[in-house]
Amino acid sequence: MAFKDNAVELEERVVAINRVTKVVKGGRRLRFAALVVVGDRNGRVGFGTGKAQEVPEAIRKAVEDAKKNLIEVPMVGTTIPHEVLSEFGGAKVLLKPAVEGSGVAAGGAVRAVIELAGVADVTSKSLGSNTPINIVRATVEGLKQLKRAEEVAALRGISVSDLA
């Protein structure tokens, strides 16, 4: 569900910058890998990675990549519709809806994704690996799994009032 229009103002946040080395015959080749999350704080978020010999260039490439991978996040008021547990690699992320006014209870990479998605109230727990790229991927995977009550009712062939 990627969006193509670049007219939307997207906020970007650098989650991680990693110095990577390739050993060649003549010595070591240094490059920088950047992980960036972009979002409009209104239900759309994406992440991207970029690699280059200079940090700003790696960030630019990552932002470009992130804009190509935007997803839509269903929300109920200021929180998510239901609890979700998602995995990617060794990372597991648990996202739970929270009451209005409780804020974003999330750490590091999860916080960046949740805030830029525009979710104001959520509780999260990172389990397993804490590698930033896998945490971000698991979080985005979890947000993709979210469904509104209307969607669930339609899939089951019943009305929303019968769902409860």
UniProtKB/Swiss-Prot annotation:
One of its GO terms (biological process) is translation. Gene3D superfamilies: 3.30.160.20, 3.30.230.10. The keyword Ribosomal protein applies. Residues 10-73 form the S5 DRBM domain. The keyword Mitochondrion does not apply. PROSITE patterns: RIBOSOMAL_S5 (PS00585), S5_DSRBD (PS50881). With S4 and S12 plays an important role in translational accuracy. Belongs to the universal ribosomal protein uS5 family. This is Small ribosomal subunit protein uS5. The gene is rpsE.
